[in-house]
């Protein structure tokens, strides 16, 4: 069974990753609000969401599905292992529900081994271990038919500039990503149509080695052996907004470079830590979100919209951990529909003879369906 595509421009599929709705909602000031969700139960919740017509796809970190043991780096290949069995149980649920897998990403941030980085760790033994973990993730992604491999910058960053080996650090990162490409080719994995870099300016490190979409594209073209295979999946509005950048500019640049492979989606208060608010939730970002979709339509881009956010900690219900998680999925999808409907209204925007301020006000009025007569009447009262 393959679920029918969403196909409301510019969105082809809506993807709800395991890490979003499974989040137990701990933060630096308090422990988890919700109980940990077993990965098989999470797959069943995704199946329920798909049955409601909310999603068509999902993604995962390797650690979202099965634990990782650095002493058993190929447990996914052992039919007698719990890892092998669990992965196939999850796949059976997703396949039955017709849920596609958009991407597999390797968690190089959760285990304390990688506290000083994964692919850029100054210790060659830890870099080698990170590569082996990434290879395991690629095998798991192959099992699920994932279309992309995501490299999120994770802990590949720094706090102290003078503690970094600047002559070699980007070479180490290139070795890791080139190695991922080589492994895909060596194993003959046909499911992967590409791999992506997900940049972030900071957090969990003080600074990241690839902080923005522009840095990611420059690195791809300047350091990787097969730049055509690699693109970017920006997390918008969050990651670029943390650095006071505008999401419309980000997608415009990436589309112009043919490097916007798919989109991670949520909301953000600019210049804050990574809020990871659900789409359209919070005090700002409505215009930016709507104009981002308007720009993507204007440029003719179409692709997967993947949620990368979590429910508000205050909205979590420990008495109904499954119900509040399902409601979070519904809220994300509802927000997407609202944003796309509002972007539809901008299709009639006429800018002839208007300056920039007039154009912005005209777009806002059009988005809110305010007619000129009503506006003029309120101006006079």
Task: Put a short name on every predicted segment.
Residues 90-93, 122-149, 168-188:
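An active-site-proximal structural segment forming one wall of the substrate-binding cleft
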Residues 3, 9-17, 46-68, 77-111, ...:
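Glycine-rich, aromatic-flanked loop segments that form ligand/cofactor-binding clefts
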Residues 1-54, 139, 162, 175-185, ...:
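Histidine-acidic metal/acid-base catalytic patches
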Residues 24-31, 65-84, 110-128, 155-168, ...:
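Surface-exposed, active-site-proximal loop segments in enzymatic domains
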Residues 57-59, 103, 150, 264, ...:
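Conserved beta-strand positions in the central sheet of alpha/beta enzyme cores
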Residues 106-117, 146-168, 190-207, 211:
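Active-site-proximal loop/short-helix segments
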Residues 20-22, 62-66, 105-110, 153-157, ...:
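Active-site-proximal loop/turn and secondary-structure-junction residues that shape catalytic pockets
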